[in-house]
Each structure stands twice: as structure tokens, then as C-alpha cells.
């Protein structure tokens, strides 16, 4: 019996050590609030996984179809039209582009597609940003914006994505 208890104690101790030695993945969240008179809102979580960042969440209240989705340079959504968020996050001074273009703004995520009920499920991976405040690609303290219209993935500097339907600070 003592031997069984000893083995169980060692097993629990090893399990506890393994659990505490695992490094947690950096995460951040943006809570999107309506802007420009829209009803668009939602929550997006950012999770750093190695060199990529996974965006996951749900956004509601938009019209059906694709809508521009970008990280903006300033973490300020105070303006009623979210113009206080500045332009697209662009630390490397690239041209506007699509999410898979080799040269683009770091904040060019592409389009979200909203269904008939006005809901978009977010499940995107991005490779040119980091969930941190440090370094040129850090996104904490910046803004996440959903636009009124589709991003054409080419027109500089905005992709003709229209007004800003929702904005949230990444933190």
C-alpha cells in the first residue's frame, strides 16, 4: 500500500511539474463596438502559435457578404466613425494587398464573410504580426476594424472597404 501511495505521489508531482513547465501561448482580445451608426459588434481572440497568429471569434449585426477586416495603427476607437484608429497597421511601409500577398500592410487581414443572419465566424491565421507590444509587428494596443464594404485587396491604401462599422482595441 505504501508503495502504491508513493508511486501515485510521484506521478502527481511529475504531472504538476509538466503542467507548470509548459509555456502559455500569448493571447489578446478585441471587443468590437458599433461605429458609424451600425449594429456590428463581436469579440475576436488573438493567439500566438509560433510564428503565426490565430484569430477566432464571432461578429454579428452586419449585412450579408464580404466586409473588409483590418488591424489599424492606433488603439483609439473613441471617434463615432472610428477615424481615431488611424490607417491600416503598416510598420514596413508596404502597399495595400490581400492576406496572402508577399507585400502588404501588416494589418491587411482581408475580408470576413457575413451570412444571411449577419454573422461572421472568425477563424483566420496571419503570419506577419505578433501578439505583443514589442517589436515592429506587435498588435497589442492597436485597433481591429470591420468595414462597411468588401476589401478589393489591391487599392492603396484602404482597399475601398468603405466606412468603419465596428472598432475594438486589441489588449
What label would you give each PLM region?
Residues 1-4:
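Positively charged n-region of N-terminal signal peptides that target proteins for export
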Residues 6-15:
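Bacterial N-terminal signal peptides
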